[in-house]
Amino acid sequence: AQVINTFDGVADYLLTYHKLPDNYITKSEAQALGWVASKGNLADVAPGKSIGGDIFSNREGKLPAKSGRTWREADINYTSGFRNSDRILYSSDWLIYKTTDHYKTFTKIR
């Protein structure tokens, strides 16, 4: 199975298929496989997988808000060990942003 985990690769996939690539699993799916965030063991229990698809609450309001819009997040550039600070954020109406500093700043990419 092809692993798609770059900003451009995931953004293009989202806009084409309206879902994350198959190498993404949610936090609860990862936990069911034995993932423990504090152990950094995702690559051990789910080889080739990245965390993605969970709701991003946008509590700080740094992403554009609109009635009915929901945001989801996915890890980017993950290979193994502990998760990094790169995330892609995508909305229910297909706005796509990235953060490389764990949600401090956001840049629109699509």
From Swiss-Prot:
Its EC number is 3.1.27.-. The active site is at residues 73, 102. InterPro entries: Barnase, N1-like, Ribonuclease/ribotoxin. Keywords: Endonuclease, Hydrolase, Nuclease, Secreted. It holds the Pfam family Ribonuclease. Signal peptide: none annotated. It comes from the Bacteria. The keyword DNA-binding does not apply. One of its GO terms (molecular function) is RNA binding. It is found in: Secreted. SUPFAM superfamilies: Microbial ribonucleases. It is an enzyme of class 3 (hydrolase). One of its GO terms (cellular component) is extracellular region. Hydrolyzes phosphodiester bonds in RNA, poly- and oligoribonucleotides resulting in 3'-nucleoside monophosphates via 2',3'-cyclophosphate intermediates. Belongs to the ribonuclease N1/T1 family. This is Ribonuclease. It comes from Niallia circulans (Bacillus circulans).
